[in-house]
Amino acid sequence: QRKMFSRSSLGFFVVNRQTSGDYDFLDPENKYNRVIGIDYNLASADNSWTGKYYLHKSFQPGDSKGNYSGQATLTWQPRRFRYIFDIQYVDEDFRADLGFVQRKGVLKNGNGFSYNFYPKSGKVSLHGPGAMALYYWRPESEWKKIDHTYSLYYNINFTNQATFRFDFR
């Protein structure tokens, strides 16, 4: 991982899971799984812009085209407001044997907005209402929308780093 600009970083990784022998009981498709990736974490000097971006590719026996997973999350947070944009795609054939993949063959898009109040004293460092919308599509099925979530919430952050959130979906 390398630092870029004032507070951002860029990282590369390789994960290799491979059997050490030729076993009769082993399915040939499970002999190995490799994932390579690049991750970028964005943080502006004043912390008003933050983001996380990644692109990963998996390799396994009988590999087909694709096998990608990618995500871009961008947050803009001046003092009182917070806006989040998130988009993620996980190809149907992406496989990470040494990690967790929630949904495959899905494009997820999310947007959120919140307003923050900052008390002058006390145990609460900030609190405020927010809204989030998440949509899920399946590109291989003519971009059919397969799920969505709408959320209204109230978030409370304490000075000891604890967080409490009421969520209505």
What are these regions (language model features)?
Residues 2-60, 126-130:
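Surface-exposed extracellular loop regions of Gram-negative outer-membrane beta-barrel proteins
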Residues 46-169:
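Exposed, low-structure sequence patches enriched in small/polar residues
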